[in-house]
Amino acid sequence: MAVPLTGSDRLFLGALGTAGDHRLHIALAARLPGPAPTSGELRRLAADSAARAPVLTYRLARGRWAPDPAFDPAHHVVEYRVAPGRDVCAAVVDAVRDNRLRPERPLWSLMAVHGYAEDEHVLCYRVHHAFQDGVGAARIAVRAVLLGRSVPAPDPTVAVRTPVRARMRLLSTGARLAAPSARLRPPPGTAGEAQPGARTFFLRLDVAAVHGIAAATGASVPQVGLAVLAGALRAWNPSRWRKAGRRGTTVSFPLNLNGRLRDGGLGNGTTTMPVVLPCAEPAPRERLRRVMEQTSVGRMAAYRRDRYPVKAPAAVFRLLRWLVSRAFLGRLTVSVIGVSLPLDGCFAVPPTYDTGGGVVSIVHSGTTVVASCVFSAAIAHADRLPGLMEQALDELRREVAR
């Protein structure tokens, strides 16, 4: 049965790109021990995953999501071999970039990246950002692909027309994210002669430090991650934040609406919540407290309840699309996803669509916390941010331990 597009689906397919645009592809990758699966094993895994998760058979058809009558799991597997010693994260980014999705088919693929080491390979689930948001993609990758569990079929009746009040609040959110206070403030300098595009960095954070801070303060892992990023941005451009009382950097913090819009993991079921990172605050623990205040369960529930883009009149949608096109320019989006896997190496590949800003996507489990960072090539000294995040985490850990 066909499922209508949500407002987010339409934005990602219309205002930001097309179904075949690899810059809007996202992925969840898992480093696994042993040799890569054979071609036959990979095809069987794709077929079994589609049987467990019917969403994997849906494609774009006449402005809706609909089951593909010619679905063939063999069209959704990719074997990508790299040279020995190749950096594993860079290899996965290359695999996503070099293997485009076909817009006439369901917008996903299962990729086996191997060759970089004799005793390890990567299994990567890649989708278009309109087909699934980060949480939806992680849910399918973990449940259907890696754990072999079933996922309900998409429900076409869940997505309903938004009330007028919700539309106005959503427009207000877009205006906040398009405001000057949301623009990234890099340190003085130039990005050199870098070509247009985006640069990707990966950072494995000290999981013991993250979990220790969370246990000692009552914070969640996402809250710790946001506070660490605030400290890194402060150290990145200290002259900007030396003045006390200066307003911080407003970032877009996506919230998944699974169950609110539809079940089954189909479409981009997210809204976004503005969070002001207190970069001007010199005390690490106070930065964490301010982040916790803005990301309370109550505030997130309110955004999930009444600020979601499903169906709206054409005029409202055009205004929202205009705001979104400005809300991403030079801005920062921060997402945090938890996965329940006993693996020591899960990480995300965020979209590489260059908006002049950046994306930080943190994937955490009981054993690892990995930050995947994508920044515009136009931003000076972006390569310093991963190291500054490590320093900010250590500063927060030491202050909490006092």
Tell me what each language-model feature is.
Residues 1-9, 23, 29-51, 58-355, ...:
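Soluble acyl-CoA-dependent acyltransferase catalytic core bearing the H(X)4D motif
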